[in-house]
UniProtKB/Swiss-Prot annotation:
Residues that bind ATP: K9, T168, D169, T210, G211, G212, M213, M214, T215, K216
Lineage: superkingdom: Bacteria
InterPro entries listed in its UniProt record: AceGlu_kinase-like_sf (IPR036393), Asp/Glu/Uridylate_kinase (IPR001048), G5K_ProB (IPR041739), Glu/AcGlu_kinase (IPR001057), Glu_5kinase (IPR011529), Glu_5kinase/COase_Synthase (IPR005715), Glutamate_5-kinase_CS (IPR019797), PUA (IPR002478)
Catalytic activity: L-glutamate + ATP = L-glutamyl 5-phosphate + ADP
Principal location class: cytoplasm
Family note: Belongs to the glutamate 5-kinase family.
Organism: Haemophilus influenzae (strain ATCC 51907 / DSM 11121 / KW20 / Rd)
Principal EC category: transferase
A GO BP annotation: L-proline biosynthetic process
Domain spans labelled PUA: 275-353
Name of the gene: proB
Keyword vocabulary terms for this entry: Amino-acid biosynthesis, ATP-binding, Cytoplasm, Kinase, Nucleotide-binding, Proline biosynthesis, Transferase
Binding site for substrate: S49, D136, N148
Organism ancestry: Bacteria, Pseudomonadati, Pseudomonadota, Gammaproteobacteria, Pasteurellales
Protein's name according to its UniProt entry: Glutamate 5-kinase
Length: 368
C-alpha cells in the first residue's frame, strides 16, 4: 500500500523550545515520530530552520553587527551543527538522511528544478529522509526564497506531496492574536484563504526565527493552490506529527481542492512556449493515452527542434496529432541518440542517465 508523501517544516522556535540552542530532547521526540511514520511506509521530507540559532550557540553568542554577512556567517557555522543533530538522532533508528540546501534559483530554473526533484525522488525511493534548508550562507536577497515556510510549500510542490505540516509555537490560526486576547478562538478549518484570513495573521513570534503567522498563511496559499492540504499545528504537542499523519484533527487545516493540483500544472504548461516536438509510435501513444504511462525512449520516432532538459515540448502521434505537452528528462541532442532504444541502453549511449523514462507522466499534460 502506497502511503502519502508529507513535507514537515520545523521552525526555529519549535526546535529550540524557547531556549537559545537546539533542544535535543524535543528533537529526539520529533525524530521518534518521523521514524515511526517512515517505518510505516510514509514518505517524509523535512524542511528545517535553526541553522542561525545553532551557529550562534556554537560560537558562544558572539557580538556581531546586525548585517546580512553576520547572518550568513552564523548560518554557515550552524548548518553543519544542525544537520549533525538530525543525523545523530536518526542514526538511533538506523535511518539515513540526505541534506539539500536550496535557493529560489533552484526552484525557478527548469533544469535545476528537475535536478532537485530527481534528487529528492532518489532519496525517497531509497528510503532516505531528505532534510532541506535554504542555503542562507550564500543566498542573496535576489535568490532567497525568503523564509522556510515558503520554501516548504515549494518543496511540497516539488515532490507532489499530499500534505504540508507547518509546525510552530502556536496552536494554529486564531480569530485574533491569542497573546493579546485571551478570548481568541482557534480556527479549525479554513476552506479558502481570504483577505479576512490574511488580516488576522500577525507578525513574527520570536526573535530567533524569521517567520510569523503571515508567512505560514502565504505558504498555505501557495500549497493549497497546488492541491496540497496544509496544516498549521503546535510543534510542542506530544505525538503531533504521527497524529496528523493518521488524520487526527489538530491545529488549523487549510483545505486543498484536488482539481487545483492538475489545473495549476495545466496553466503553467499551457502558458509556456513549445520548444520542440517529439513524435511517438502507436505503442507509446496507447501507453500514454490509455494506460497513463510515461514516455520511454523506445517509443520515440523523431525529435524536432533544439531544447534543454525541462523545457516544454509537444508530443505528436505518427498521424500528426498533438496529444500532450510535457517536460522531457533529456535534452534534444540526447533524445536523438536514445530514440527507439531500450531504457537499459541509455547510460551506455550517453555516458549518464536521468532515469529510465524520456518524459515522466507527472510532467505531462494530455491535450483534449
Amino acid at each position: 500500500m502506497n502511503k502519502k508523501t508529507i513535507v514537515v517544516k520545523f521552525g526555529t522556535s519549535t526546535l529550540t523550545q524557547g531556549s537559545p540552542k537546539l533542544n535535543s530532547p524535543h528533537m529526539m521526540e520529533i525524530v521518534r515520530q518521523i521514524a515511526q511514520l517512515h517505518n510505516d511506509g510514509f514518505r517524509i521530507v523535512i524542511v528545517t530552520s535553526g541553522a542561525i540559532a545553532a551557529g550562534r550557540h556554537y560560537l558562544n553568542h558572539p557580538q556581531l553587527p546586525p548585517t546580512i554577512a553576520s547572518k550568513q556567517l552564523l548560518a554557515a557555522v550552524g548548518q553543519s551543527q544542525l544537520i549533525q543533530a538530525w543525523e545523530k538522532l536518526f542514526a538511533i533508528y538506523d535511518i539515513h538522511i540526505g541534506q539539500l540546501l536550496l535557493t529560489r534559483a533552484d526552484i525557478e530554473d527548469r533544469e535545476r528544478f528537475l535536478n532537485a526533484r530527481d534528487t529528492l525522488y532518489a532519496l525517497l525511493d531509497n528510503h532516505i529522509i531528505p532534510v532541506i534548508n535554504e542555503n542562507d550562507a550564500v543566498a542573496t536577497a535576489e535568490i532567497k526564497v525568503g523564509d522556510n515556510d515558503n520554501l516548504s510549500a515549494l518543496v511540497a510542490i516539488l515532490v507532489q506531496a499530499e500534505q504540508l505540516y507547518l509546525l510552530t509555537d502556536q496552536q494554529g490560526l486564531f480569530d485574533s492574536d491569542p497573546r493579546k486576547n485571551p478570548e481568541a478562538k482557534l480556527i479549525p478549518v479554513v476552506e479558502q484563504i481570504t483577505d479576512h484570513i490574511r488580516s488576522i495573521a500577525g507578525g513574527s513570534g520570536t526573535n530567533l526565527g524569521t517567520g510569523g503567522m503571515m508567512t505560514k498563511i502565504i505558504a498555505a496559499d501557495v500549497a493549497t493552490r497546488s492541491g496540497i492540504e496544509t496544516i498549521i499545528a503546535p510543534g510542542n504537542r506530544p505525538n503531533v506529527i504521527a497524529d496528523l499523519a493518521y488524520e487526527q484533527n489538530i491545529g488549523t487545516k487549510f483545505i486543498a481542492h484536488q482539481s487545483d493540483r492538475l489545473e495549476s500544472r495545466k496553466q503553467w504548461l499551457f502558458a509556456a512556449p513549445s520548444a520542440g516536438i517529439i513524435t511517438i509510435d502507436n505503442g507509446a501513444q496507447n501507453a500514454i493515452l490509455e494506460q497513463n504511462k510515461s514516455l520511454l525512449p523506445a517509443g520515440i520516432i523523431n525529435v524536432e527542434g533544439r531544447f534543454s532538459r525541462g523545457e516544454v515540448v509537444k508530443i505528436r502521434t505518427q498521424s500528426g496529432k498533438d496529444i500532450a505537452l510535457g517536460m522531457p528528462r533529456y535534452n534534444s541532442d540526447a533524445l536523438q541518440l536514445i530514440k527507439g532504444r531500450k531504457s537499459a541502453d541509455i547510460e551506455n549511449v550517453l555516458g549518464y542517465e536521468y532515469g529510465a523514462v524520456a518524459m515522466h507522466r507527472d510532467d505531462m499534460i494530455i491535450l483534449s
